[in-house]
Amino acid sequence: MKILITGINGQVGHALMQQLTDHELIGITRQDCDLTKPDQIRQVIDQHQPDLIINPAAYTKVDQAEDEPELAFQINRDAPKVMAEKAREYNIPFIHFSTDYVFDGKKNEVYVEDDPTHPLGVYGQSKCAGEEAIQEIGGL
């Protein structure tokens, strides 16, 4: 299986590259594809035609996101949306990673996928918006 993995210099992306060695891996770094540029994302996916897209890449500077909301939303909302659109176009699975920052932390139990979101800051809002965009597109 040919798997395209974004953010391979990050903790999760790097770990995936180490663990999925039985597959043909296409590791994408910031230098390979600027996630603020939708056309670059489309081009990379079209070029490699993967069987699966895994997106652990994210804007993760929680505090700095308050000062750079546009950048946070470009990377955490817009980029995953483009990836989900391409995955749907190619009829392939798309795996995207969430964060606990999509919740407000007021629940006294463990959060689950179906819990209502209520992000308090820009980082959580941008990640939540990305998830909503992916859900609207649907797919595998």
Locations of the language-model features?
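Adenosine-cofactor binding site in Rossmann-like domains, unifying the SAM/SAH pocket
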Residues: T21-Q43
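SDR active-site strand-loop-helix element
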Residues: T6, I28, I53-A57, F94-T99
